């Protein structure tokens, strides 16, 4: 039995007015799945599993605005409204949430990793609804556990922050996940391949830039780089990063986008990547056929305005699933 795991029991979705797939919405098509069901066998074809990570403990430790614990429900509600374009050949299963208000951050990350591995063993592509960006380390661990020790796993993070902070004194938090991944790779004598899109210089100290400069395998583009380059040059940079890689894990921190597009986040951003450009870049990553899982994190519904941020997060999920279904 998976720890801290709660299958969905309350529907966030609606039945709609008919059963015609040409007019169906996500909320009419998505079905519940219990990962603890021992009778399940690996699925054939390309299918997805949606799981919520109900934790913003890392945000609290990092002195951010808490509220991301409420985001899985908010994103599900927005996603349910979107039209379904994938017929009956592709399924998106809602498998529930990882939740443990009295559990430690490390325990919840470990529980998420085991749920992710279970999804991968069932041949389901994980989609995680954070939660703070501490979500990423648990997701990454689960993906790595589903691979052999020699398999590669590159990481792309769309984020205004590197999230490479040391954690020896403070302990893990929402800003340390990728340093934890880096340290794991060093311990295993692997190269940690990490590409951050949307870095803002005013959100990252000199220590972090120096760490990146000295670390082979880590690349980044600032938000201003992306603005000047345009999506085609950004996509070419991603292609170079992924050359020779077989698998990539993608994580989207909603503070990558300006407060006008994403007001409901843990750390608001005055500047940010254009969401339209982001969709083109995300579609390109998905079209590589290398994407094995992704998450959307740091949506904070108590600070949102008319569900703008939750809707944008759901929009990214919509377009990623559309393309992944065609290229996996």
From Swiss-Prot:
<comment type="pathway">
    <text>Amino-acid degradation; L-histidine degradation into L-glutamate; L-glutamate from N-formimidoyl-L-glutamate (hydrolase route): step 1/1.</text>
</comment>
<dbReference type="GO" id="GO:0033389">
    <property type="term" value="P:putrescine biosynthetic process from arginine, via agmatine"/>
</dbReference>
<dbReference type="GO" id="GO:0030145">
    <property type="term" value="F:manganese ion binding"/>
</dbReference>
<feature type="binding site">
    <location>
        <position position="161"/>
    </location>
    <ligand>
        <name>Mn(2+) 2</name>
    </ligand>
</feature>
<keyword id="KW-0378">Hydrolase</keyword>
<keyword id="KW-0464">Manganese</keyword>
<dbReference type="InterPro" id="IPR005923">
    <property type="entry name" value="HutG"/>
</dbReference>
<feature type="binding site">
    <location>
        <position position="163"/>
    </location>
    <ligand>
        <name>Mn(2+) 1</name>
    </ligand>
</feature>
<keyword id="KW-0479">Metal-binding</keyword>
<feature type="binding site">
    <location>
        <position position="253"/>
    </location>
    <ligand>
        <name>Mn(2+) 2</name>
    </ligand>
</feature>
<feature type="binding site">
    <location>
        <position position="159"/>
    </location>
    <ligand>
        <name>Mn(2+) 1</name>
    </ligand>
</feature>
<dbReference type="InterPro" id="IPR023696">
    <property type="entry name" value="Ureohydrolase_dom_sf"/>
</dbReference>
<keyword id="KW-0369">Histidine metabolism</keyword>
<dbReference type="Pfam" id="PF00491">
    <property type="entry name" value="Arginase"/>
</dbReference>
<dbReference type="GO" id="GO:0019557">
    <property type="term" value="P:L-histidine catabolic process to glutamate and formate"/>
</dbReference>
<feature type="binding site">
    <location>
        <position position="159"/>
    </location>
    <ligand>
        <name>Mn(2+) 2</name>
    </ligand>
</feature>
<feature type="binding site">
    <location>
        <position position="255"/>
    </location>
    <ligand>
        <name>Mn(2+) 2</name>
    </ligand>
</feature>
<comment type="similarity">
    <text>Belongs to the arginase family.</text>
</comment>
<feature type="binding site">
    <location>
        <position position="253"/>
    </location>
    <ligand>
        <name>Mn(2+) 1</name>
    </ligand>
</feature>
<dbReference type="InterPro" id="IPR006035">
    <property type="entry name" value="Ureohydrolase"/>
</dbReference>
<comment type="function">
    <text>Catalyzes the conversion of N-formimidoyl-L-glutamate to L-glutamate and formamide.</text>
</comment>
<dbReference type="GO" id="GO:0019556">
    <property type="term" value="P:L-histidine catabolic process to glutamate and formamide"/>
</dbReference>
<feature type="binding site">
    <location>
        <position position="133"/>
    </location>
    <ligand>
        <name>Mn(2+) 1</name>
    </ligand>
</feature>
<dbReference type="GO" id="GO:0008783">
    <property type="term" value="F:agmatinase activity"/>
</dbReference>
<protein>
    <recommendedName>
        <fullName>Formimidoylglutamase</fullName>
        <ecNumber>3.5.3.8</ecNumber>
    </recommendedName>
</protein>
<dbReference type="GO" id="GO:0050415">
    <property type="term" value="F:formimidoylglutamase activity"/>
</dbReference>
